[in-house]
Amino acid sequence: CNTWLADNYSGLGIDDYSRIYLTSFDIDKHKKARRKNACFLYEKLSEIANFLFPIEKMDCPLFVPIVINKDRDSVHKRLIENEIFCPIHWSHPNANCKSNLYDTELSLVCDQRYDLNDMERIVDVLSKLLFEKV
């Protein structure tokens, strides 16, 4: 694999469009938006959600992984029906595994494309789903 990468990608540089985009990209603005969204999710869902990781001072999360203890796949489906996409990042491996994380993890997207109104909607819909029979 490394040999193939070295043979096919050596000496390639970034294209002009990407260089211009990256130099004009406001990294701090996006980091702040992500942290603000993630902290909002943690604050509003702290009573009803099991978070996999705490938010650390330097984190810039793309998503907040939570554990859904009731039928995660049904909750996931209902979120999609409400036009809220939450990826499942750790799907079942082919091998036998004793961890139930593969059946319970759901990622709440909180990147810079979203604002607090979007986060509030995620919280509202998810809260209703977790307290009803899915």
Where do the model's predicted regions map?
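PLP-dependent aminotransferase class I/II
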Residues: C1-V134
